[in-house]
Amino acid sequence: MLLLGGGAIALPAQSGVQVTPMAQAILLASRSDPVPLGGALNELRVVQPILTLDARALRGLLIGTGTLNFEAVTMPGGELSSAVWGEGFVDRRHPHTVVHELNIAGVDLLGGLDGRGRIGVVLGKGFVPFGTDDPMSRWLSRYPVNHHLAQIVERAIAVAQYDVGKVTIEGALFNGDEPERPDQWPLIKQQDGTWRFGDSWSARLTLRPVAGLELQGSQANAHSPEHRPGAGGDAVKSSVSARWKDSPHWGERYLLAEWARTSELEGTFVFQSVLVEGMLRRGRWSGRFRLERTDRPEEERLDDPFRSRRPHLENSILGISRWSLNTLGLATDLARPGGMLQLMLFVEGTFGQVKKLDDGIFDPIGLYGTTSVGELRIGFSAGWGMRNHRMGRYGVLASAHADHDASGMSNH
């Protein structure tokens, strides 16, 4: 076994095969005020503990991606995080499935027959080609409120890609249902013979007009995402974004602006999000920010006020809230910036407002006792090789346009 540059491992018994291990985890102390039923809450947890293997063969024409996520062990009750929601959790971020990604991609299937173009295919489990990068591979430890509006995660996917020059087109079929618990796999086919896989689709166009700039537009239709048996309605989703990332001699710069929209029950419920975030690093110190305004469905909650009913139908939506939040962060590298090992101390503060957006019965004063939102997070992150990984970028995007200077969450 031979360790190559960039952390890749060459397997001598299988010439041309390289395996790149990546890992990260964050020890996080947080305080949220308010929480459901009023008051404040403090927590100490390990969040985002993952192990990823990137395997490449046939000179990079065959790429395998596998990621294990251990949040089911370190945060089975979710991560305290005001306004965040999804998969039956509210004001807590849900633990991801244990097998977070497991897929294989073929790149440039036609070789030189299609000229400068390259055709790719991705099969397995992972991120649907829709929206922006997963927050786990971005600069703030806190997930945005719009995670389930701006990304579609942990599905069985069949993706076709075409890449030529500065343009990449992707189309995918996937199962509409999202996971209900960390050990659950995507539902491929129901007992009555109805296929869940293939009942939903997405398409994404990515443009790279100049070095460092990436423009993205995508559309998706997810069938019954919150009702696994498929009795729910469709979620029609749209996303547009612009991303800038470069690395001048003195450090790094990053900026993302995105708009996302999800419509349910043919426009009966519409949720929109606008988000801008950025980072500036000079030497060992970096500052980061996020400005977000996102609409959230207010669902029927259980006796545990941090949990909502599953399986979920649209008639369980009690209203729509709008969260306008601002997050500022400061971090310092304890290891050499740009190296494979990442060790970082960080602090993040979030403040903002929540308001009722429609005529539903949801009342923020009644639930939280206030419309003001505040959160403080102090953490230590450790990682290996995560700078080279933009989670959810498969096939032709992983092989030719991976952002090898992009930071993973080990750079909090």
Q: Where does each model-flagged region fall?
A:
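Beta-barrel outer-membrane channel/assembly domains of diderm bacteria
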Residues: 9-109, 373-377
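Surface-exposed coil loops of outer-membrane beta-barrel proteins
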Residues: 28-39, 77-103, 109-206, 313-317
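Outer-membrane beta-barrel "beta-signal"
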Residues: 368-412
